[in-house]
Regions:
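Active-site-proximal alpha/beta segments of enzymes that process anionic O-linked groups
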Residues: 4-192, 286-288, 293-301
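Metal-dependent active-site segment of extracytoplasmic phospho-/sulfohydrolases and closely related
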Residues: 19, 208-249, 281-285
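Short, solvent-exposed loop/turn segments at the edges of secondary structure
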Residues: 41-42, 252-254
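Active-site rim elements
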Residues: 58-63, 197-204, 242-244, 264-275, ...
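Membrane-interface soluble catalytic domains
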Residues: 69-79, 91-100, 106, 218-224, ...
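Short beta-strand segments
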Residues: 85-87, 176-183, 203, 230-235, ...
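Active-site-proximal segments of metal-dependent phosphoesterases and phosphodiesterases across multiple
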Residues: 190-213
Length: 346
């Protein structure tokens, strides 16, 4: 999973740049996909669990209950998979024993005081700036995650690991890895070659994201574990450019979704099936049963009504359901269904 990667820009990058000409062969790319949520907070637990958040309970309880009853984890457990979750922010204090080998909710970590102090002072300095200076300043990102020893999601960090680690550990048992990478998330601070810069563009960071994914695929190939792997490349949600038209906010619901089954071989296929993340639980089951990506979503075709759940950032207590009969990029066709999920009214 890469963060904040819209399908439109990703398609533009991989279809026009020579370096990606064959990078995604063997995959089916579902370009007309709709995510269920527009933000990471709800999208990640939904993708992993198959359970929707409709504000029936506070988010902490929802996330724990959803993951404890994950249809995906249950399917993996039944097939004796070893499971690993790599995510900077996913804190799951689960009660059900799914034997997550590196469960971020139960792992002990060590605090690096110097890094913590640096991040804390950035916050304090900004908080107490005079208002006039505050208007001309901003803190794009506070990296409190750097203060502890845990998984780092940075594209550059992962790219270095994928390209410079000499060996990977192999096992005869079935393995599941969920990796949540930075992707095209703001700030737009990365060029096409993984260098951190100021005032970058979304296309630059999208190119870096594609390069990161390609390096991961090459790493699997080099170690002989590519062909027998199911690979799902996805984003938690898409991206809304600054100063975009009002309805462009709905571009956050059009993430990338590319899938490869076991021993699948063909040129990259672009599919315009009207897929929804609500279809993922069934797709997971079919992939685990050996289906190829070209055989997924067999009964899905236009016209189809798809639903999403929208809320404004930091106003998650008020959710509004939308539906559309159009393509993921036809934002003028989205309409409210009348369903509203308010936490305060439960």
């Amino acid at each position: 999973m890469v963060d904040s990667q819209s399908a439109t820009e990703f398609t533009n990058v991989i279809s026009t740049q020579e370096q990606f000409r064959h990078a995604f062969d063997d995959f089916t790319y579902y370009t007309d996909t709709l995510s269920t949520y527009a933000y990471t907070r709800d999208s990640v637990p939904y993708v992993l669990s198959g359970h929707l958040n409709k504000n029936d309970e506070n988010f902490g309880d929802y996330s724990e209950n959803a993951l404890n009853n994950s249809t995906l984890f249950n399917a993996l457990e039944e097939r004796d998979y070893d499971m690993y979750l790599y995510d900077e922010d996913l804190a799951w204090y689960g009660k059900k024993d799914f034997d997550i080998k590196n469960n971020p909710g139960t792992r002990n970590v060590s605090l690096r005081f110097g890094e913590y102090f640096k991040q804390e002072m950035r916050y304090v300095w900004f908080k107490y700036l005079p208002y006039g200076l505050k208007k001309a300043s901003e803190i794009e990102k506070l990296n409190f995650g750097n203060t502890i020893d845990k998984f780092k999601w940075g594209n550059d960090v992962l790219y270095n690991e994928f390209n410079n680690v000499s060996e990977i550990e192999k096992t005869s048992g079935a393995q599941f890895r969920f990796i949540h990478a930075e992707g095209a998330h703001v700030p737009l601070d990365m060029d096409e070659n993984m260098n951190r810069i100021k005032d970058g563009t979304y296309i630059q960071k999208t190119t870096a994201t594609a390069k990161l994914i390609a390096s991961f695929i090459n790493r699997l190939k080099a170690n002989g574990v590519y062909d027998n792997s199911v690979i799902v490349i996805m984003a938690d949600h898409g991206y809304q450019p600054k100063n975009a038209p009002e309805n462009y906010i709905l571009s956050r619901f059009n993430p990338i979704l590319l899938i490869k089954g076991v021993n699948e071989k063909h040129d990259l296929i672009y599919s315009e099936k009207p897929v929804s993340y609500l279809d993922l639980p069934q797709a997971y089951e079919e992939l685990l049963d050996g289906k190829q990506s070209t055989d997924l979503f067999a009964d899905i075709e236009y016209p189809r009504t798809r639903k999403v759940i929208w809320y404004e950032i930091y106003k998650e207590e008020h959710m509004v359901e939308y539906e559309t009969d159009g393509k993921a990029t036809e934002w003028d066709k989205f309409r409210e269904t009348g369903e509203i999920f308010d936490l305060s009214k439960k």
